[in-house]
């Protein structure tokens, strides 16, 4: 293969807290979210080519488009219309699962294509999706606005996360439509100095989309109950617009044992929360 081939990693994006604080006149929702990344994700390989192509492989490839409907393809068209590249996406994250799989893939594609094509990634990546700028940033951050305002947060304490999806896809538009209000209070100022104080801070936050997502997919409530009952699970919540849920654990052993105790027909994985 060409020495110019790019191989990149697209880690899962997790909204540990997600407040919906308003709706703009153009229809976009204003968000305030603590976003982190987990040590599990998709992989993307890009090689120079005359024409643009996308091959989707991996254990979560079913149902993922391999054409212009895919955010990876859209990222290429947005960055440099008409340029060619052969892209292979190895899918490990659930499609439409609320953990930014498509956005993380698009961000990885932008980095790789910029390298292959020797171009810069311009501002405005939120045009591809609200989560794309934060996935380009790739570090723990407070995300506000329509995903375009990124603020630094205190260093995260070491922790592990168990991610669970019971096989449900929850359309983001339907979740927003089902919300009773979209003018909720913002996040409290991020402040913590260890795992326990971080959990205290999290308890003061919400996912404003969780209730409406559960009305669309009641199994989300079942997943959260199963997570809460696991030994060592210190905090549970739904990520993004659903339907992936998470549990936070202090140690790898606790997270691993918890993951092993969940139904085998669900998508379940455990990983460290990436601190930088």
From Swiss-Prot:
Stated EC number for the protein is 2.7.1.148
* Pathway the protein acts in: Isoprenoid biosynthesis; isopentenyl diphosphate biosynthesis via DXP pathway; isopentenyl diphosphate from 1-deoxy-D-xylulose 5-phosphate: step 3/6
Tell me the keywords, alphabetical order: ATP-binding, Isoprene biosynthesis, Kinase, Nucleotide-binding, Transferase
Domain of life, source organism: Bacteria
Q: Which GO terms describe its molecular function?
A: 4-(cytidine 5'-diphospho)-2-C-methyl-D-erythritol kinase activity; ATP binding
The record's annotation in Pfam families points to:
GHMP_kinases_C, GHMP_kinases_N
Active-site residues? 13, 131
| Swiss-Prot/TrEMBL GO biological process terms | isopentenyl diphosphate biosynthetic process, methylerythritol 4-phosphate pathway; terpenoid biosynthetic process
Instruction: Identify which top EC class this enzyme belongs to.
Output: transferase
The catalysed reaction is: 4-CDP-2-C-methyl-D-erythritol + ATP = 4-CDP-2-C-methyl-D-erythritol 2-phosphate + ADP + H(+)
- Which of this chain's residues are annotated to bind ATP? 94-104
User: What family is it from?
Assistant: Belongs to the GHMP kinase family. IspE subfamily.
Give a short account of what the protein does.
Answer: Catalyzes the phosphorylation of the position 2 hydroxy group of 4-diphosphocytidyl-2C-methyl-D-erythritol.
Return the HAMAP family for the record. IspE
Protein name listed in UniProt: 4-diphosphocytidyl-2-C-methyl-D-erythritol kinase
Q: Which organism is it from?
A: Jannaschia sp. (strain CCS1)
């Amino acid at each position: 293969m060409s020495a110019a081939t790019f191989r990149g990693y697209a880690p899962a994006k997790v909204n540990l807290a997600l407040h919906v604080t308003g709706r703009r006149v153009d229809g976009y929702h204003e968000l305030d979210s603590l976003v982190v990344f987990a040590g599990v994700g998709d992989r993307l390989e890009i090689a120079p080519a005359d024409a643009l192509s996308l091959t989707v492989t991996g254990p979560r490839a079913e149902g993922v488009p391999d054409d212009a409907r895919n955010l990876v393809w859209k990222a290429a068209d947005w960055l440099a219309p008409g340029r060619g590249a052969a892209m292979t996406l190895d899918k490990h994250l659930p499609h439409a699962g609320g953990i930014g799989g498509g956005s993380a893939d698009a961000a990885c594609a932008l980095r790789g294509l910029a390298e292959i094509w020797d171009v810069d990634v311009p501002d405005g990546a939120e045009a591809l999706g609200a989560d794309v700028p934060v996935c380009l940033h790739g570090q723990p951050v407070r995300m506000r606005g329509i995903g375009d305002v990124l603020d630094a947060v205190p260093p995260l304490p070491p922790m592990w996360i168990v991610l669970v999806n019971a096989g449900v896809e929850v359309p983001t538009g339907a979740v927003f439509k089902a919300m009773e209000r979209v003018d909720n209070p913002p996040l409290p100022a991020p402040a913590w100095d260890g795992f326990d104080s971080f959990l205290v801070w999290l308890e003061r936050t919400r996912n404003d989309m969780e209730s409406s997502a559960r009305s669309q997919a009641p199994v989300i409530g079942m997943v959260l109950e199963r997570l809460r009952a696991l030994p060592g699970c210190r905090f549970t919540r739904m990520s993004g617009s659903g339907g992936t849920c998470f549990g936070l654990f202090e140690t790898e052993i606790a997270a691993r044992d918890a993951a092993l105790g969940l139904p085998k027909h669900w998508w379940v994985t455990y990983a460290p929360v990436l601190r930088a």
